[in-house]
Amino acid sequence: LSTVGTVTEIYDYLRLLYARIGHPHCHQCGLVVKPQDITQIVSSTVDLCVAHPEYTKKKGTRIMILSPIAKNKKGEFKELFSNLHKKGILECRVDGQILKTNTTQTLFKNNRHNIEAVLDKLVIGSVQSKPEYEKQRLTESIERALDISSGEVIVSIVTDPSFSFPDNPKQLEDHLFSQNLS
């Protein structure tokens, strides 16, 4: 289409037509992408958490609320991390890894980076939590994310076991303090 479209000069018209009448869809889930207000985002998030395969009524679904700060941008971003820490944001997800904002981050200035501020980590739908408190906290976190990133929010379901925070942690044992583990 691009060669034919360019040669016949119809490409610009097709692009304009698709932009006006087209409906963008999510490439992962197939749902139509459209603007939503905060209550719709909260409702969709809760529905997504309950429908997630790792959801159980006892444990719920663990999520992180993220605010995109830099998308595919080059730089070291030292000042950005400092400013985020001053605003009370303690963690960022940088290129998929969670990093603290108060430590000196060394990013390659010639590489492109994706940086998202971690605004909240919470569990949706567990038996210990109260639904009205969950919704209020989720709403506040999403509002803050939308304010910081000018209308965008990322809700990430945490399935990585390294993010596990057990209710009943294991007891400390002497072999955990072995020099072989250091």
Where are these regions (language model features)?
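Long, non-coiled-coil amphipathic alpha-helical linker/lever segments
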Residues: 115-118
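Cys/His-rich Zn2+-binding cysteine-cluster or related metal-binding knuckle/ribbon modules and their
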Residues: 1-110, 120-182
